[in-house]
Amino acid sequence: YVVWDHQQDSRPIYIADIKTAADESRYNVTQSTLDRYLDIARTKYGVSNDPQFGEFGKKKQTNAVFARIDWQLNATNLLTIRNNFINEDNKQSESDNSSINLYEVWIDRKSHNNSLLATLRSVLSPKLTNELKLQHFLVYEATTPNKQLPSSNIPRAIVENVESISGDKSMYTSIQLGGQRYAPEHFKDNVLQLVDNMYYNTDRINYTFGADFMYTNMKSLYGSEMNGRFYFTGLDNFENMTPYRYAREIALVDDPTVKMNTLNSAI
């Protein structure tokens, strides 16, 4: 039989969506401050003319397909094949760790995994049964920058102590543009596992004898904080392009991709 499951999430995301005074208090920023920030970001830092604050549509969908077939080869041998595939496409999956992050900061995340399992169950005698299993498992996940940014990502610019005045009250927040700190990164794992168990049942004791062999191939690119970040204090320094600090993690090799092969066994 075959089963398909589909899930879809279209709840919007809100980025400093200022409509009332209560919104200003919640975000610690006024619309006039956002307007000034965005004008600087566009004229001096190349931010897109597309909207960066407000309400945005968000799409996340997951599809899962499961299939199974049982094949009675003969009176004593049953072959079962199962396959489970899951695919997820999550647009604007997450932003960053500043209080307010522009829309361009939000990353996309895609992933899929597939598990294929074949089981041969053989009844050798009334007291003896053998079960042989072979499984391949694939996992892949990729995180990519927002479509408004290059695929290789760009540095972040974090403006701290952004002041807004509402009535007689001063409010402060931090606003960020540029690339999210994780992207781009990807993880791909292949696992091949062979298990053979023999079950011997007596009137008083049930015995299990088995062997398990598992081979894993991993290929990963971890990109956390490797795009770099500039720190500014206040909008005046942001406008004058005078950061007080720059930080970046760098790879010590030309290709930072991590490749690993492991073999595990048990009896």
Language-model features, listed with the residues they occupy:
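Predominantly transmembrane beta-strands of Gram-negative outer membrane beta-barrel pores used
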Residues: Y1-D9, Y14-E24, F66-D70, R82
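Glycine-rich, acidic and aromatic/proline-enriched surface loops and short helix-turn segments
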Residues: W4-H6, L34-I40, F85-N87
